[in-house]
């Protein structure tokens, strides 16, 4: 696909040009403004640094959390601006609004190499509006900040891979108004995901966890036809176990999906692999005493919170021979130490396979958080994606609006 890259833009020369960048800076921030996982901020640095070094006047737009379309101090990008400045090693200005008087004044005062971060784009209800005309109005206001009126030299760089599956003003509509380019991050992500959907090296193993089958159904259906083995763990494995006629106690169960899982097992039984043992507890709590039971022996009064050691052993054997691996979703409640061994064991198996030459991708979201929280080496994997939802939708075979518009 003919998407222009950041290198294409830099080779045209950007000194003195206004460049609007959509970054993904949606990181976890606590009430005191502390960022527990700066992964997405770090991932946004290469594009911003390259543009700033080349003398562009950089205006960055991003969101944090899910504010209700109006300013909310809880979702201010102030702590993000500070952290971004530290990672970049240069000052990042924060506008007090999205496209208001402060943003305009600051944008007009930018000199070559300066970086201005606009306040949370989702403070403006037009960003996520379903009304095309409303979104376009906001997009035009954003374009104005980089002097992008007719005949100007302004440009748009899409670098927020975590939002490319959303048809939003700062992701989609601005790209219809300005010459557009994929930033380093988006460029890398597209190439990596293409390797997972096109003929990669075999055997191809997929590991899916997380709580709900309904969230992953389309990706299971799409990848079950492409993968040699598809490992199911996390909360969603109980709906599959129930589909086999097993009792799952008080474990998470999507009743409405049992029949769907039964059909998937009928159609792809040779590809799908379920846990054979489960770590159970009486309640969903870090201090709830844990015990391991066979998958067909879950007591009525207990819930499964992790896969057991025998499952880890079997999944490790599958993964050790794989040449291409995609992992999305934890195997258990890794936030509680007593229920983290399944996720850690499977992650270590993927790292082991990668060390032997496999191409491995961690599909964003909770899996990436688990890697960091469990103290696993991030460079043990070929690639850790920054976009959970976006990478899943890509692997489902869906068109991503934010990518489509760049083509």
UniProtKB/Swiss-Prot annotation:
Intrachain disulfide bonds: none
Subunit-structure text: Monomer.
Recorded name of the encoding gene: pgk
A GO cellular-component term linked to this record: cytosol
Record-given protein name: Phosphoglycerate kinase
Similarity comment: Belongs to the phosphoglycerate kinase family.
EC number: 2.7.2.3
Compartment(s): Cytoplasm
UniProt superkingdom: Bacteria
Single GO MF annotation: ADP binding
GO annotation, biological process: gluconeogenesis; glycolytic process
Binding site for substrate: 24-26, 40, 63-66, 122, 166
The keyword Amino-acid biosynthesis appears for this protein: no
HAMAP family per record: Phosphoglyc_kinase
Keywords noted in UniProt: ATP-binding, Cytoplasm, Glycolysis, Kinase, Nucleotide-binding, Transferase
Reaction(s) this enzyme catalyzes, per UniProt: (2R)-3-phosphoglycerate + ATP = (2R)-3-phospho-glyceroyl phosphate + ADP
Pfam families linked to this entry: PGK (PF00162)
